[in-house]
Structure formats: C-alpha cells, structure tokens
C-alpha cells in the first residue's frame, strides 16, 4: 500500500507541468494492478466511472485561492447496488483530502434499519494561510500556486464496480452570515431545508467579532433525526483524538425537535474560531422509534437562532436564592429561643435529681383524669416537681435503680432519680451510626465521577442529560445552576439538626411522660439531608441513569427513617440497629439493580422482595396493635393494595425506568404511612399543636409547588439523548433558574417543613403518661 501511494505522489508531481485532461494516465505497478489518475474540473458536479478489478482510481482537482473558506462535500455512490446485496463488509473505499483535512468513506453504510450504498462528508475548508507566506516565501504573489483535492477509489472485490462521485462546493457566503452588525446580538435563520445529502455549515470567528459567549438554538417541527457538530476551525469534523492529554472541543449532539449548545468564555478564549455543522441522518432509529420518514433523503426544515452573549455573573441570582432560603430560618428563630428558655426553666437545681413530696399510699393506684393530667403538666413545667399522683410510676422506677433518703423529722421524703440520658448524650452511640462512613465514600465517588465525565474519552453531550437550554456552566461543570441550588438541602438539614438538639429538653422526663425519645434518629435524618445535597450535586455533574444511583439512596434512606421513627416513637426508642439495617437494605437493593440492570428478570426479583417486605410490615403491624386491629384494618388494606398496584405497574409498564422503581416505592410508602399516622391521631382524638399544623400546611404547600416544577419534564434520561434534548426549555427565573432548579429550592423547603411537622406532631403528648398513650 505504501508503494502504491509513493507512485501516486510521483505521478502527481510530474502532472503539475501538464495541462488538465480527462484522459487517464495509467501507471503500471505490477502485472495484475494499475493506478489510473484523472484530472477533473471544478465545474464537474458528478463524475461517473467504472472501477475495474485490481485498479485504483485517483482523481485530482486543482484548488486556487477562490476556494478559500469554501466547504467541499464529496459523496460516493455505488450505481447498481443490487449486484452486491449478498456481499458482506466494505465494497468500495473512498479517501478524500485537500491537504488541510481528510476523511474516509466506506460503502455500504449500515444503519439499524437501513443499508445505504451512498455516503458523503465535508472537508474543512482551506484558509488564507494555506496560500500565504509562511509556507514558501518565494511563492508570495505567485498566481499559479495552488492546493489539490485528491480522491482515491479502490475496492477489495475482484469485480468491476460502477460508481459515481458528487463533488459540491458550498460557497463561503453562508459563513459570512454569522457576522454580527454593531449592536446586534441575535440572528435567525428560519425553515432552512436540509437533506441527508445536503447538510449546512457555519463559520464563527469569535476573536474578530469580540464574542465572549455564544449560544446556538436549533428547532424543527418536522420528524427528524440529526446531528449538530461543532469543532474548532483547525480540527477535523469527523476525527476525534484518543490522546488523553490532548485538549479538544469537538462536540456531537444528536437531536430531534430541539438542540441547544453554549460556547463558554473559556472555550472561546482557547479555540478562537469554530465551525458549526448540521447533518440529517438517513434513519430515525438513532433518535426515536417513532418515525414518519418515507425515504432516507427527505427534506427537513430546521430554524436557527444565534445569540451573542455578554459575560454573565451568577452573583445576583445566587444571592437572591440565599436570601429566599434563609428567610424561613427567621421563622424558627423564636421557636428555638423559646425552647432554650423552657429547657432552662425545666432544669432542677441538681440536673440528675427529681424531688417530690409523698402522698398517702391509697392514692398511688389512682389513675389521673384528663384534668388532673393538665394540672400535672402545668405543675411540672412551673417547678419541675412530679405530682403525688405519679408516685406509682416513680416508685416502680425507684425499685429498679434508685437511691432513697428519708428525713423522719418532718416526714419529707427525697427520692433521687437519675434522669435517663437520651441517645444523643450517649456519644458512643454516634459511632454505631453509618454516617461517618458514608460521607467520605460519597465524596470520593463524586470526585471520581467528575474525572470520568470530563475525560477526553467521554462524550458528555450524549452521556449527560442536561437541560441545555438553561445550563449555566462554570469551569468544567456544564450546569452550575443545577448544582448550586442543592445548597438548600445542606442549609435545611443543618437547621433541623440544630432544632433537634435544642428540643432535647422535651425528653427530660421521657421515662415517665410523652413518646419515646429519638433525638439521634432526628439528627441522622438531618445528616442524610445534608448528604442528599452532595449526592444531588454529584448527579448533576452528568445526569444519567448511572448517576441517578448517587442521588436516590439518600432519598430512600430519609423516607425509610421517617417511617422507622413514627413506627417506634410510641413503642420504644429506635436503636442504631434500625438505621444500619435500613442502610444495608437500601445499598444492597441499589447494587442489585445496578448489577442486573441489563437482565430481563430483575424486575421480578424486585417484585418478590417488595412482596416480602410489604407482607412482613403488615403482619408486624397487626401483631403489635392488639385490640386496635379494627381501626387500622382499612389502612393495612389500602397499604397492601397501593403496593400491589405499584408492583403491577413497574412489571408491565416500561415507562418506569428500573432505577426509579425503588425510589418511587419508598416515597409512596412514606407518604402513606405519614398520612396513616395523622389520621390515627385524629381518630383517637389527639390534639395536634398549632406549630405542627402550621408546619404541616406549609409542607403541603411547598410540596405542591415543588411537584409542579418537578413534573415540567425538561429532561428525561429514560429516553435517548436526542429525545431528551427535545424537552429542553429556557430558564424560568432571572435567566438562571430552570424548572429543576426551582424543584431543588422548594423541595428542600418542603423537606424541612415535613421534618419539623414529624418532630412536633406529638408535642401534645409530652405530659401524658406512656401507659396512657395510644399505640398505633
């Protein structure tokens, strides 16, 4: 092969002194093969020839300075393709070069639903420097100095092949379109007609036009599948370097109805000028399964919008977002102050003692009426003393682990009762929770995932499902707005942690009154809220079905912890074991889904696990309720039917992606259990405090707003990249916040109000004896 090309080069050097001719000049390379060279004219649009067996055709077109910045498209076609329908592999190979760029055509081209015996590509055009002084100084001003377009045609078959070459020159005028007038920031091209064999290209010189940022939008009403390719002016349109340390900016976007691409200030300063191309695909299967295409070369209409942008600062929208997020914190500041004041009032002179005066023993077995309980709570809040009617409970506790001293002189008895410490006071229990292990693992995963998505081997435009119409980049991050808006989870998670710690005082007498304490569990929920912000930010580095696994486990754990909390708050203090079991289950389930995502039976495995878990929960609930079964039978039936419906849906409907099943099931069950808990409080005539009602109402309102933005569907990684790009929508607020950003903001706010509602919902029982609290 090297010998053949050396002979071709020698023949071309000799041919420079000869006149143009269409008569082939054969060079015999062996007894069985030859190379035929043809001189072609720029006026020839179509060239039809017969490639004989063991022959190589070389076609040469002389390019002078009139071809500067003109695109050249070369297409090849096998004339009678029916002869080769049974042939496998490449039949005809065509190489094209103009000295600056080159490409290779291999026919036939095989698509999923189509085999084409024609194909064509574009060459990067020649520029002024290709005819300038830096090449050869003595050529300056030489009108005969030129470049060459070389096309070689060969075949591996031992047969004659009739072929056609189509050589089209796209005039430089269409590049000049992207020159903006003074003060002009937007240019529009409407309803441009493109076909598979008729693409369109543009040239953008950012340095000449003082462009710092640039945005291109394409939209079409036709049913199409196309590729948008942008490449620096000095790089090939089709080739992509696999050298890991080579900087490049070749971007390929498949699209249907809409495509957006944004050139950042960093990209423009690095590459200066770009070429933008749009190619219509002959087959729609790469973008969508639905198509109305009748032939591979149908005309399609596409409109273009080019916007010249100024440098945008993210400071103003970020500052306004922080002001909005911190405003609810001011609402809870008086609550925190009041809690701290009350906790100081409740504290006795000796923090680990409770003193009280005895009453006759015949009163010890009497139950408190409702009014007596109210008086008891008032008395307790005022002076920290346990009233006489509670001596029975105190006596029982004293029998286990107490010290009693009696002063016989005045018959006043002092009973020393060490107060039971809550779980947060037992610092050793903190180490039993898995939070300390999860955080560094999650951070390491985020860093490694970012490195992978920014490598030269990754096509982020096809792998990452951003809303390109409202993606605001920062450095290597394509959608900084989607990342920074997760700060609400961090802020509100920290607030809930502080609030939970401040409310520890309400469990000072938890061994006697109120529901069981779960301070450490509340703190864990707040910590996972903070972890959710990190996980969601990691996901938005490159949103996809793979990255979705970073985001969802934290959501699943939070939903699970809320159910565990409300399940045990009336039975016992939740231990770290429940959190660890829940976390192991969530991680194992997500690992199972990831490991077997390509298998057809994984949904049935999930369904079996789902049935076992639901059945176990229903049986455990019935056993723990005893006489309360009749009141909760409706809930158990609704709970079972709801989960059964979910199982049927994700087994039969492919619309639910495999990675979404577990998350949606956790969320639905959490909502159902919280609704059940609230309904049971109402059925048992328990009072819900005004603070809990306020937080509950605000959480419902915030969830409604967040849900509205969540279901706007500006991306969808369950579809193809092109189909997802068709859903992209412009920013809704301040040119920075899209619908998903607003979902982050209001979702974090709704989560905070939900957590506080759950924490406050049983405050009416804080002075009620544990033996009198309803179990459900």
Swiss-Prot record:
Carbohydrate attachment residues: 19-20, 32, 205, 210, 234, 290, 311
GO cellular component: lysosome; membrane; plasma membrane
Effect of deleting the gene: Absence of silencing in adjacent cells or tissues. Decrease in transgene silencing when combined with eri-1.
Transmembrane region(s): 320-340, 430-450, 482-502, 511-531, 544-564, 576-596, 600-620, 634-654, 660-680, 692-712, 742-762
Outcome, altering residue 565 to C: In qt4; Failure to spread gene silencing signal
Signal peptide: 1-17
Entry GO MF terms: double-stranded RNA binding; RNA transmembrane transporter activity
Subcellular location: Cell membrane
Miscellaneous comment in the UniProt entry for this protein: This avoidance behavior is transgenerationally inherited, and thus progeny display this same aversion despite never been exposed to this pathogenic bacteria.
Descriptive protein name: Systemic RNA interference defective protein 1
Organism: Caenorhabditis elegans
Gene name per UniProt: sid-1
């Amino acid at each position: 092969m090297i010998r053949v090309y050396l002979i071709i080069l020698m023949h071309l050097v000799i041919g420079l002194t000869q006149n143009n001719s269409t008569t082939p000049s054969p060079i015999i390379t062996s007894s069985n093969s030859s190379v035929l060279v043809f001189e072609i004219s720029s006026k020839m649009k179509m060239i039809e020839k017969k490639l004989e067996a063991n022959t190589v055709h070389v076609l040469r077109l002389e390019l002078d300075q009139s071809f500067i910045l003109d695109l050249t498209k070369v297409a090849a076609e096998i004339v009678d393709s029916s002869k080769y329908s049974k042939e496998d592999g490449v039949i005809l190979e065509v190489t094209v070069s103009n000295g600056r760029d080159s490409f290779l055509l291999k026919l036939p081209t095989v698509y999923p639903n189509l085999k084409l015996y024609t194909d064509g590509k574009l060459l990067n055009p020649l520029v002024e420097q290709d005819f300038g002084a830096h090449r050869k100084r003595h050529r300056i001003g030489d009108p005969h100095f030129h470049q060459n377009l070389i096309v070689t045609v060969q075949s591996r078959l031992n047969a004659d092949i009739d072929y056609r070459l189509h050589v089209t020159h796209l005039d430089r005028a269409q590049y000049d379109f992207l020159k903006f007038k003074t003060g002009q920031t937007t240019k529009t091209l409407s309803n441009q007609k493109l076909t598979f064999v008729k693409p369109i290209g543009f040239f953008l010189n950012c340095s000449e036009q003082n462009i710092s940022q640039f945005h291109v939008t394409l939209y079409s009403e036709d049913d199409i599948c196309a590729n948008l390719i942008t490449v620096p002016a000095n790089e090939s349109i089709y080739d992509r370097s696999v050298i890991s340390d080579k900087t490049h900016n070749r971007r390929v976007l498949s699209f249907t109805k809409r495509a957006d691409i944004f050139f950042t200030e960093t990209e423009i300063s690095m590459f200066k000028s770009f070429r933008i191309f749009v190619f219509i695909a002959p087959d729609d299967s790469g973008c969508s399964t639905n198509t109305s295409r009748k032939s591979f070369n149908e005309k399609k209409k596409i409109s273009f919008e080019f916007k010249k942008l100024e440098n945008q600062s993210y400071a103003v929208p970020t500052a306004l977002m922080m002001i909005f997020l911190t405003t609810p914190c001011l609402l809870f500041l008086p609550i925190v102050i009041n809690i701290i004041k009350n906790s100081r009032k409740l504290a006795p002179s000796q923090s680990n003692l409770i003193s009280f005066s005895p009453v006759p023993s015949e009163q010890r077995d009497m139950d408190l009426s409702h009014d007596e309980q109210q008086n008891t709570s008032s008395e307790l809040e005022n002076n920290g003393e346990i009233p006489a009617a509670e001596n029975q409970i105190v006596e029982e506790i004293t029998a286990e682990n107490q010290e009693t001293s009696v002063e016989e002189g005045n018959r006043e008895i002092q009973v020393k009762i060490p107060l039971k410490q809550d779980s947060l006071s037992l610092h050793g229990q903190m180490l039993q929770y898995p939070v300390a292990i999860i955080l560094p693992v999650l951070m390491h995963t985020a860093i490694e995932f970012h490195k992978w998505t920014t490598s030269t081997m990754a096509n982020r435009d096809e792998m990452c499902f951003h809303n390109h119409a409202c993606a605001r980049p920062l450095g290597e991050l394509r959608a900084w707005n989607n990342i920074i808006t997760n700060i609400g989870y961090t802020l509100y998670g920290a607030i809930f942690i502080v609030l939970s710690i401040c409310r520890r005082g309400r469990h000072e007498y938890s061994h006697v009154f109120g529901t069981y304490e779960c301070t450490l569990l509340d703190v864990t929920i707040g910590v996972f809220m903070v972890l959710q912000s990190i996980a969601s930010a990691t996901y938005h580095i490159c949103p996809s079905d793979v990255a979705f696994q970073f985001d969802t486990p934290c959501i699943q754990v939070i939903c699970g912890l809320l159910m565990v909390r409300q399940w045990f708050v009336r039975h016992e203090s939740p231990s770290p074991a429940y959190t660890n079991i829940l976390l192991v289950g969530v991680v194992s389930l997500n690992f199972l889904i990831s490991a077997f995502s390509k298998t057809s039976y994984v949904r049935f495995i999930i369904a079996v696990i789902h049935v076992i878990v639901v059945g176990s929960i229903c049986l455990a609930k019935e056993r723990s309720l005893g006489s309360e079964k009749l009141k909760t039978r409706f809930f158990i039936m609704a709970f079972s039917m709801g989960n059964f419906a979910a199982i049927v849906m994700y087994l039969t409907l492919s619309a639910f992606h495999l990675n979404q099943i577990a998350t949606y099931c956790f969320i639905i069950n959490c909502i159902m259990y919280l609704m059940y808990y609230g309904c049971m409080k109402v059925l048992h005539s328990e009072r819900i405090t005004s603070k809990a009602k306020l937080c509950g109402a605000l959480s419902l309102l915030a969830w409604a707003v967040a849900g509205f933005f969540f279901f706007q569907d500006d991306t969808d990684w369950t579809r193809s990249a092109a189909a997802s790009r068709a859903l992209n929508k412009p920013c809704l607020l301040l040119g920075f916040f899209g619908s998903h950003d607003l979902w982050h903001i209001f979702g974090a706010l709704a989560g905070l109000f939900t957590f506080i509602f759950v924490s406050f919902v049983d405050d009416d029982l804080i002075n009620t004896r544990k033996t009198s609290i309803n179990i459900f």
